[in-house]
Amino acid sequence: MELFKELTDVSQGVRRLGAAAVDLCHVALGVVDATWEYQLKPWDVTGGCVILLEAGGKLTTMDGQPYSVFSRSMLASNGPLHPQLLQYTQPKTEALLRQGFDLSEWFVPRGYNLK
């Protein structure tokens, strides 16, 4: 909640539609500049991730690590805004990890290459 408040304070507004794939498509279209979320599952985001990346958007975990559909946190942006967003999301995510919040990858099928 603290992260939500901080990002609301430095942005022109925060909007959540309830569907991560739709949020990713809105970033890809330029309707919004970014979206972020914790505790997603692969089926929540896969289609939207493809659309965002094909449109030239940037996608990482909220602590700046490479993203895969098995990641439990996601930060997506128009690209140029990404480093500024990470200044907010990275320390908050690291604090959650120190508190024992589970952001390990969801089940990755045996033999599946994340790279």
Name every feature range the model reports, one short phrase each.
Residues 1-115:
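IMPase-like, lithium-sensitive Mg2+-dependent phosphomonoesterase catalytic core
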